[in-house]
Amino acid sequence: MATPVVTKTAWKLQEIVAHASNVSSLVLGKASGRLLATGGDDCRVNLWSINKPNCIMSLTGHTSPVESVRLNTPEELIVAGSQSGSIRVWDLEAAKILRTLMGHKANICSLDFHPYGEFVASGSQDTNIKLWDIRRKGCVFRYRGHSQAVRCLRFSPDGKWLASAADDHTVKLWDLTAGKMMSEFPGHTGPVNVVEFHPNEYLLASGSSDRTIRFWDLEKFQVVSCIEGEPGPVRSVLFNPDGCCLYSGCQDSLRVYGWEPERCFDVVLVNWGKVADLAICNDQLIGVAFSQSNVSSYVVDLTRVTRTGTVARDPVQDHRPLAQPLPNPSAPLRRIYERPSTTCSKPQRVKQNSESERRSPSSEDDRDERESRAEIQNAEDYNEIFQPKNSISRTPPRRSEPFPAPPEDDAATAKEAAKPSPAMDVQFPVPNLEVLPRPPVVASTPAPKAEPAIIPATRNEPIGLKASDFLPAVKIPQQAELVDEDAMSQIRKGHDTMCVVLTSRHKNLDTVRAVWTMGDIKTSVDSAVAINDLSVVVDLLNIVNQKASLWKLDLCTTVLPQIEKLLQSKYESYVQTGCTSLKLILQRFLPLITDMLAAPPSVGVDISREERLHKCRLCYKQLKSISGLVKSKSGLSGRHGSTFRELHLLMASLD
């Protein structure tokens, strides 16, 4: 009897050279999982079929690098934002530019299409969020509230809300109809890179550079659970179509999570590096990553991945819509999104033949739109993907065939054949998570939850590092032994970059030391600030903090803005240095500042007093700005929490 061929659970599909220069952004079409759009430093947007090596279409018109791209749900429109702040919308079926939208003052960091209406949301480095009406070619509303770049935008499935994630460590929820913020979700300690709505329930997931994923209840506006211990910054998450689990694209692995309670269902090794986007089609998860000018695509067979804590359900068929949301046994039922009633499966297309129905564009916009082109590189692939939509109804949508899985390597096949289950069973240390058994094993009692790891106040162990990460890993059957060259390549990875960083820091410190030896402390601090490297500022402040007599009032005016940055840093040593410096300033200079501001004006001209009064006003303004940050962090637990509470008491006189 022939031995059945064992196929891989995850494999690399293809690698392409997507642009003539570096790739800066990419996105997968979520409806088909087969359409890929890439934006590059060559100012172009290129479209690809995920399983073909040739570019389908190249969209031109931007005059600066493309920073963000997004496809709408039916994959008929694409929007791209550039480094200059301009936004362009193309019609893929008509193969032409549809709109040029101007208004942001900095590069576009995030985009999203409204699921039903013809609206686009954009987030920028200028901290603003704008909602655009594609039909009228204008900004409908501007949402303000973030203090740093907006990295991700997502509309809710019912189209009533907009979630935003930013570098200021917060997630905000906006009501589109009321035009105001509904709630702010603090809790992350690093920039938030991605947010994703649950497909059915009032639940939101957010991933951050602090290596955590948080789940938020959108009825009670509070955190449901927090998954910690991700191997790196969280950049890409995706809910399963039936909402039973969340996929997280980690560094070289795919992790499957539940949230009530927080636990890890499965971990699959995928050598995709830093995955940029995920999509699901035909029970296969497609992941794409980019490096320099190359884009790589990977496939994970979800039929061999554990997605719930109970017996696996029948796979969701992509060629037919869900009749109703499948209940998640691991979570209580929440309120379900109410989709608006529609007469067709896609929004009404923009009419191009009636110029009077929309605002007349300026002559500059006309010129920009005339210069924008859609160059069809492969007519056969273009007609196959886009042209049939004009004459063939897309209800039900066209079904694509799953990608065939390649067989395992010979050595791996022999080992896999000896296993009772074809699924790859790899155990990873996942802190604070409960790893459930795979089906068909049914556990009568839940597995005990791991005790949370406590980071000691004294740094007798590396913060953020776990000894289990350095233990010998379980041998992976499908991976061959590393040859010497590959092993050395892995060891050297990042070495050149670190050398550049350390060399630059050494040069900057030499510059500051040269000024310091002249005895001018204020000029030394000014030069450190001008370098625009917080590590140099921290090194200098650690020296100044040791001798309180070095502090002067004019030094405070320079240091206080840097202290505000340090208090918001994700590095513990930076925060600690900022707190120490702020405490010294408050103890030595706050009484002087308050007395100077409260004193009546003097008679006659006193130049030195006027200069001192001006410095006191600057310090008071900066301290007021910092006081809000200190108050928000005074509720933290641990050593930093007590330090911030002490600072909050010292700053009470500012109120």
UniProtKB/Swiss-Prot annotation:
Residues 285-434 are annotated as: Interaction with PAFAH1B1. The keyword S-adenosyl-L-methionine does not apply. GO terms for biological process: cell division; cytoplasmic microtubule organization; microtubule depolymerization; microtubule severing; mitotic chromosome movement towards spindle pole; negative regulation of microtubule depolymerization; positive regulation of apoptotic process; positive regulation of microtubule depolymerization. Transmembrane segments: none annotated. Pfam families: Katanin_con80, WD40. Residues 1-284 are annotated as: Interaction with dynein. Residues 1-300 are annotated as: Interaction with centrosomes. Residues 311-422 are annotated as: Disordered. The modification Phosphothreonine is found at T395. Residues 433-655 are annotated as: Interaction with KATNA1 and NDEL1. PROSITE patterns: WD_REPEATS_1 (PS00678), WD_REPEATS_2 (PS50082), WD_REPEATS_REGION (PS50294). Its main location: cytoplasm. The keyword Cell division applies. It comes from the Eukaryota. WD repeats lie at residues 18-58, 61-100, 103-142, 145-184, 187-226, 229-269. GO terms for molecular function: ATPase regulator activity; dynein complex binding; microtubule binding; protein heterodimerization activity. Belongs to the WD repeat KATNB1 family. Interacts with PAFAH1B1. Interacts with KATNA1. This interaction enhances the microtubule binding and severing activity of KATNA1 and also targets this activity to the centrosome. This interaction is weakly competed by KATNBL1 which has a lower affinity for it. Interacts with ASPM; the katanin complex formation KATNA1:KATNB1 is required for the association of ASPM. Interacts with dynein, microtubules and NDEL1. Interacts with KATNAL1; this interaction is weakly competed by KATNBL1 which has a lower affinity for it. It is linked to Lissencephaly 6, with microcephaly: A form of lissencephaly, a disorder of cortical development characterized by agyria or pachygyria and disorganization of the clear neuronal lamination of normal six-layered cortex. LIS6 features include hypoplasia of the corpus callosum, severe microcephaly and developmental delay. Participates in a complex which severs microtubules in an ATP-dependent manner. May act to target the enzymatic subunit of this complex to sites of action such as the centrosome. Microtubule severing may promote rapid reorganization of cellular microtubule arrays and the release of microtubules from the centrosome following nucleation. Microtubule release from the mitotic spindle poles may allow depolymerization of the microtubule end proximal to the spindle pole, leading to poleward microtubule flux and poleward motion of chromosome. This is Katanin p80 WD40 repeat-containing subunit B1. It comes from Homo sapiens (Human). The gene is KATNB1.
